[in-house]
């Protein structure tokens, strides 16, 4: 695809009119048919849809998340519904994912429950892999990719990116993944594309020749497919 769209829709999103719904109710009310029709009218070939950001929630009944902290999922499987509605137009679905952290105003205990501990990150990494494996196997080829944000949070934990990648590609070995390094060089070779935060100049970049393959020919992101958001 030449281009896609990214949508930031989370537990903190507000409706245009009326009061904010409880997350599960907002997921239940999401009109996927109208959404897919709108995306199709833009000509986009794929979308990146935000799942968790800031607060850790996920719009589907994922047992591994419920086991960590109940009340962070939904009974409706919005991801599957998006795959179906977008797929009717030939549009692929990718998901944005943030490992989550406590709410900055009212800490809710997510980081403690998920095992985030810089001195012993094994529980945190194990939980992340369990969540990714369940989600990946649930959606298979319907889930085309992952955009993992905020690499500055988990890179200092020295995770095994090969292990994370295997979990990320569960159910679909062709699923593309990236770990957002912000403005820093890439964190690992075990990824498929460059997230592109702050890379608005990609069209004129010396390492991305015009009419080329779209893959960096040199520099800190050499061999990664270029992407910007």
Identify the function of each model-found stretch.
Residues 1-229:
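Mature catalytic domains of secreted/periplasmic carbohydrate-active enzymes
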């Amino acid at each position: 695809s030449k281009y896609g769209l990214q949508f930031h829709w989370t537990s903190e999103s507000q409706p245009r009119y009326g009061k904010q719904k409880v997350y599960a109710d907002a997921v239940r009310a999401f009109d996927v048919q109208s959404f897919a029709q709108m995306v199709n009218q833009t000509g986009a070939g794929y979308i990146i849809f935000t799942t968790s950001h800031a607060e850790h929630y996920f719009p589907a009944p994922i047992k591994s998340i419920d086991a960590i902290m109940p009340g962070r999922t939904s009974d409706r499987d919005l991801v599957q519904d998006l795959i179906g509605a977008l797929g009717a137009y030939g549009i692929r679905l990718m998901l944005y994912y943030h490992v989550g952290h406590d709410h900055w105003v009212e800490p809710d205990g997510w980081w403690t429950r998920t095992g985030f501990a810089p001195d012993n990150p094994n529980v945190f990494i194990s939980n992340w892999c369990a969540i990714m494996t369940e989600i990946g196997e649930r959606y298979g080829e319907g889930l085309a990719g992952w955009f993992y944000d905020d690499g500055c949070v988990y890179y200092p934990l020295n995770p095994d990116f090969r292990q994370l990648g295997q979990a990320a590609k569960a159910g679909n070995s062709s699923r593309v993944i990236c770990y957002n390094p912000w403005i820093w060089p890439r964190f690992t070779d075990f990824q498929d594309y460059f997230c592109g935060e702050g890379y608005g100049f990609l069209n004129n970049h010396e390492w991305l020749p015009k009419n080329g393959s779209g893959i960096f020919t040199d520099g800190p992101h050499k061999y990664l497919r270029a992407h910007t958001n």
